[in-house]
Amino acid sequence: TIENGRDDLAVRRIINVPKRGIGATTINRVQEYANTEDMSFYDALRVAGTIPGVGKSVAKLDGFVQMIQTMRSKQPYYSVKELIEDVLEQTEYRKELMSEGTEEALDRLANIDELLNKAASYAEHADNPSLGGFLEEVALVADIDNLEEDADHVVMMTLHSAKGLEFP
């Protein structure tokens, strides 16, 4: 969302992580408004005060939008790792996962550490490191990791997406 507010699915996935008390009804009303006005979900959040039926949730939605705007303003000055660390600090996501204490929460904490390591490595090796470039690289690796090695099919990709990958 910091990089691309037009990715409605991504915005909807993070709007309540960690929990912000924004209910499904509010999210659905914002989505309906976005669809009616032919705008992105994030753009609809930015004008939440004008959406009928949102009511008391406006303050929570405004807080979310303000956080994203603040992160966007820091983007040119922060490394990818610093930006991720700032998001974690501002949202208190790590704190929430630690208090959960479940196996899944511990796995997520380990994933966060791995993401931070990848961000640091990306900054060292990329010619012109950016959040967009990092997200593209991480998405590429995730796609390749999800491939089944023993599956009986051909995998096609662009030359751009194959850059930096190794094949047997």
Q: Model regions: which residues?
A:
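Conserved helicase C-terminal RecA-like lobe
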Residues: T1-P168
